[in-house]
Amino acid sequence: MKWKAILPKLTHKYNNGNHIVKIFDDGTKVKETFDPNADHFTYEYPESFDLKITDYCDAGCAYCHENSTKNGKHANLNLIHYLFATCKKGTEIAIGGGNALEHPDIELFVSYLRSLGLIPSITINQRHLQSHYHKIVKLMDNIAGIGVSLTDPNNEDDFRIINELGKNVVIHVIAGVVKPSDYKALYGRKVLILGYKDIRRGHDNLEKHSDEIKSNIEQLKKDLPMLKKRCEVISFDCLGLEQINPKEILNISDEEFNAIYQGHDYDMFDKDGNITVSTLFIDAVNMKVSRSSTAPMDKRYSFTGKEHIGELLIKSCEGYDGKGK
């Protein structure tokens, strides 16, 4: 008798800073330092980054941290084509807006990224699932995943579309916005919990509804153990980790947490001055780069699009002492 394990297929492999990165077709990522005694990773290229390609959106969310409106402008994507040609094959790019589906070049752009060996994904608002259904279906061949920002847990037509799109859909919820009445839409699904962003309309909304938002966050903390059992996967962005603290709530050991924690957006340098962050935020509408989408306005830096992607990683760290100050 012969037994053969079905192992995931290696799709990307590249060197970055002091380590090697391997990505498999099931989404698994393995990183190993060249020096087995090294206790942290350093980076010359971003491993992944968020990319805003439009400020246009008709959803009108009260907590939108990008201030997206119907008057928002689209990015000129031709200006940033060179940047992507300098990325390592296997770099993950999370495309958003605004409503990225409204960008007239979204299909060509995603196809271009794929042709370079990059791994694009896209985040959309649930409100746009039905109106942009055909475009989403076309995009699915060239994107690794789709994030759907939850707005209506009771819309059966929307969730039929989500089910049709398959296992690469992740439901996005915001700490402080998501409520217990929304939970049923999360059961059995992959979920990303985002921290509440206290900037732009998000700031105005927080001032008006501070007690409700804080109460929702506290309730989410209490319900997290139950959600962990009932959802297929739960992940967090850096702000979500800060606001919810799943390590403490779920009693995750230091060893287990360190194995899955991707690092803080603002832990930028080691003692030798090497870059220790793997991500950045690129605002292609305003041609600005920063550590994250919530960075202070005076720490968002202009770029031309003719730079090497590694230069933008360095630029995103300017003005900080390495501890986010």
Where are these regions (language model features)?
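Ankyrin repeat (ANK) tandem alpha-helical domains that serve as protein-protein interaction scaffolds
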Residues: 78-86, 107-111
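Residue-level recognition of short loop/turn positions
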Residues: 60, 97, 285-286
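Canonical Radical SAM [4Fe-4S] cluster-binding loop centered on the CxxxCxxC motif
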Residues: 36-78, 293
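Residue-level signal for well-ordered, solvent-exposed loop/turn and beta-edge residues enriched
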Residues: 28, 62, 287-288
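Cysteine/selenocysteine-centered motifs that mediate thiol-based redox chemistry or coordinate metal-sulfur cofactors
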Residues: 311-325
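Core AdoMet radical
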Residues: 48, 66-75, 89-103, 113-132, ...
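Radical SAM enzyme [4Fe-4S]-AdoMet core and its adjacent flexible, acidic
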Residues: 141-285, 289-307
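N-terminal [4Fe-4S]-dependent radical SAM core
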Residues: 1-51, 68, 258
